[in-house]
Amino acid sequence: MKQRTLWMWSALGLVCGAVHAQSSVTLFGVVDLGVLHTRAGGVGSATALGNGGLSTSRIGFRGTEDLGGGLRAGFWLEGSLNPDSGTGRATNTNNQPSGATTAGPLVFDRMSFVSLSHTQWGEVRLGRDFIPTHYNSIYFDPFNANGVARAGNLTFSGVGTAPLPTGITGSNTVSYWLPRQLGGVYGMAMAGTGENLSNAANSDDGNFAGARLGYASGAFDVAAAVTRSQFSATATIGNYTHANIGGSWDAGFAKFFALYNRVTVKLAAGSVRKNTAEIGAHIPVFDVGRIRLSYAYLDDRSDSALRTAGGQPRSGDDARQIGVGYVHNLSKRTALYGTYARISNRGEARYTVSGGTAPVGGHGSSGWELGVRHTF
């Protein structure tokens, strides 16, 4: 009897060990804080503890289970953090202004999905994720869509007078991702819903669809993406289309980036049209750091019916932005960084560096940040 009991426990241990070997769960995150100083033309300056100057502060959990035959199940839960105050960030539950939450406890605002993937057939995700066009912003903006010099200072700011709920992430989505073994071709397609009643006046609000297709080989990478969201036209929001194309080339002595964005929002009074072009580079400094450079230009081509607060055509509200920074790696997980950015506004434009206060119309905005990032 004793030998039989020992045999049973040994067999159970082998089974548990096999299951454990097929599954994994990882805790990961980033804590990024620094001193941020911004100046708004005609308004003044401010100094604060800035968050996410190099990478967005976050905490997350991800896991996979090997189901055999090349099939895997997985999940990803990732939420933004405000480590300067110990709080989480806001999210949006239905891709509409009505679904916006307030910042507070930790929520998984960045990504929260379950997935099934196969080595030959690709991956299907269900949940919340970044929209297709934002992936281009992450990979082809020299400042990785973070900090005072990020391209988003011009791309999304001032589009309407209301935030775009699907400008970066989307809720209630289903997406398909191509398998990796396609000779350098990669891509994905996504659809999301606002989950409104079919007989509601705003039944289509919050629905969106998009796709991204790219090719990477060696030092070269290029991708194009488009996302279209539906909203009932008002004075501040309407059907929204974002298309972009970007690329990078690593020449060894420097890595070069280019990104072009076109944003259109159909408001009740007319269409907002913004074209933003950005070029930049990473220049390695020995084996421990890199210099980051960028120049971006915004050309506003909105309908003449859309006017500024001063009664002038909005199409004259162009802007330019320069950014320069340096990242110094203390280890694989810890880095020091410094960044400076300046925006020159035209007309009555009030574009602002990230974390700053809007200037008087037509005046400039600038800022610098010095910080430390630690990953785990």
Go through the PLM ranges and name each one.
Residues K2, L6-A18, I59-L67, H118-G122, ...:
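Outer-membrane beta-barrel proteins
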Residues S23-H37, A46-G194, D205, L213-G218:
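Outer membrane beta-barrel
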Residues T26-F28, R72-G74, E123-R125, Y186-M188, ...:
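Residue-level detector of the transmembrane beta-barrel scaffold of outer-membrane proteins
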Residues G44-T47, S98-A100, T161, L197-N199, ...:
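Extracellular loop and loop/strand-boundary signature of outer-membrane beta-barrel proteins
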Residues R58-G60, M111-F113, T173-S175, G210-R212, ...:
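Membrane-embedded beta-strand positions in outer-membrane beta-barrel channels/transporters
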Residues D204-N329, Y340:
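Detector for outer-membrane/organellar transmembrane beta-barrel domains
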